[in-house]
Amino acid sequence: MKVSAALLCLLLIAATFIPQGLAQPDAINAPVTCCYNFTNRKISVQRLASYRRITSSKCPKEAVIFKTIVAKEICADPKQKWVQDSMDHLDKQTQTPKT
């Protein structure tokens, strides 16, 4: 009985401090997507819809994640020429014409 009362008291004290630990900006707790392996094959630009760069210090490698037109995400090495060319192509597609 004494153990149960002590445990209950400890849980109540801990519960008092938990909300303070959870009150953090969402960006701190946001999941980080990392690439651990890169594709060995060149992807046709006709299959690509978009890309994003991964430069987080929490990831072991800098990477580019291409999203295909069928919503598949593929990790690629940003140092490879075909990756840079594909990013340039996608950038040109998304630019709005100047009037």
Swiss-Prot record:
Distribution of this protein across tissues and organs: Expressed in the seminal plasma, endometrial fluid and follicular fluid (at protein level). Expressed in monocytes.
Protein name: C-C motif chemokine 2
Gene for this chain: CCL2
UniProt-reported outcome of changing residue 50 to Q: 40% reduction in activity
Signal sequence range: 1-23
Assembly and binders: Monomer or homodimer; in equilibrium. Is tethered on endothelial cells by glycosaminoglycan (GAG) side chains of proteoglycans. Interacts with TNFAIP6 (via Link domain).
Family to which this protein belongs: Belongs to the intercrine beta (chemokine CC) family.
Gene Ontology biological-process entries: angiogenesis; animal organ morphogenesis; antimicrobial humoral immune response mediated by antimicrobial peptide; astrocyte cell migration; cell adhesion; cell surface receptor signaling pathway; cell surface receptor signaling pathway via JAK-STAT; cellular homeostasis
Compartments in which it is found: Secreted
Site (Involved in dimerization, receptor binding and signaling): 36
Function: Acts as a ligand for C-C chemokine receptor CCR2. Signals through binding and activation of CCR2 and induces a strong chemotactic response and mobilization of intracellular calcium ions. Exhibits a chemotactic activity for monocytes and basophils but not neutrophils or eosinophils. May be involved in the recruitment of monocytes into the arterial wall during the disease process of atherosclerosis.
Induction: Up-regulated upon hypertonic conditions. In pancreatic islets, secretion is stimulated by IL1B. Up-regulated by coagulation factor Xa (F10) in PAR-1 (F2R)-dependent manner in cardiac fibroblasts and endothelial cells. Up-regulated by thrombin (F2) in endothelial cells.
Gene3D superfamilies hit by this protein: 2.40.50.40
SMART domains recorded: SCY
Effect of residue 89 to A: Strongly reduces heparin binding
Site for Involved in dimerization, residues: 31, 58, 61
Primary site of residence: secreted
GO cellular component labels: extracellular region; extracellular space
Modification after translation, per record: Processing at the N-terminus can regulate receptor and target cell selectivity. Deletion of the N-terminal residue converts it from an activator of basophil to an eosinophil chemoattractant.
SS bond partners: 34-59, 35-75
UniProt-listed PROSITE patterns: SMALL_CYTOKINES_CC
Residues with the Pyrrolidone carboxylic acid modification: 24
Glycosylation sites noted in the Swiss-Prot or TrEMBL record: 37
Site (Involved in GAG binding) residue list: 41-42, 81, 89
One GO molecular-function entry: protein kinase activity
Keyword annotations: Chemotaxis, Cytokine, Disulfide bond, Glycoprotein, Inflammatory response, Pyrrolidone carboxylic acid, Secreted, Signal
Residues the UniProt record annotates as site (Involved in GAG binding and receptor binding): 47, 72
UniProt source species: Homo sapiens
